[in-house]
């Protein structure tokens, strides 16, 4: 008699974050978060909590206010010692590179926005070489404008004595894309 090996697929645990604004009421935000939860599930993540905040508009620095970001951080710390710690926070909007970097530094987990989540799903599902190439191109197009903000912590790399100023980190990143 054969024995079957049962293996568990390890999924990441996620938190969803959305804003309630004048343009997007609470019902619409709930609908968008329901859709985002479905997308997260499709990508292999398990949603355990939703955070919403009523604001006039997103914060340019961290998308949500400092108090809400603190609430999210406290929840992540609370779940650290459990079997399934929080692995990512998914925002129901497109984040700037500055927002992503600031939020990631504050929370210490992977940060995704709706666009990057959708691109990840397409990358997972792409079958043909052509489809994989198209998804990769879309991911690069998405990343390219964010390179400048991602590498603000790095200085220009010198070109050496007599060989000019050298290339900046953004230029090196663009070349690699």
Question: Which positions does each model-derived feature cover?
Answer:
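N-terminal accessory targeting/assembly segments
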Residues: 1-114, 118-120
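Canonical P-loop GTPase G-domain recognition
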Residues: 106-168
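Active-site-proximal binding-pocket segments
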Residues: 171
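Conserved small/polar residues in nucleotide/adenosyl-binding loops
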Residues: 175-177
């Amino acid at each position: 008699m054969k024995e079957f090996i049962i293996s568990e697929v390890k999924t990441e645990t996620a938190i969803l974050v959305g804003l309630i604004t004048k343009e997007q009421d609470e019902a619409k935000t709930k609908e968008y978060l329901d859709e985002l939860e479905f997308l997260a599930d499709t990508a292999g993540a398990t949603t355990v909590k939703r955070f919403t905040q009523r604001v006039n508009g997103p914060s340019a620095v961290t998308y949500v206010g400092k108090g809400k970001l603190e609430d999210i951080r406290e929840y992540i710390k609370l779940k650290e010692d459990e079997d399934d710690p929080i692995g990512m926070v998914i925002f129901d909007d497109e984040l700037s590179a500055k927002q992503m970097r600031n939020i990631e530094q504050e929370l210490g987990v992977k940060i995704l926005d709706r666009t990057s989540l959708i691109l990840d799903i397409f990358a997972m599902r792409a079958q043909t070489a052509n489809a994989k190439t198209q998804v990769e191109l879309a991911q690069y197009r998405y990343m390219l404008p964010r390179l400048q903000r991602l590498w603000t912590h790095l200085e220009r790399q010198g070109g050496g004595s007599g060989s000019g100023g050298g290339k900046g980190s953004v230029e090196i990143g663009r070349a690699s894309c």
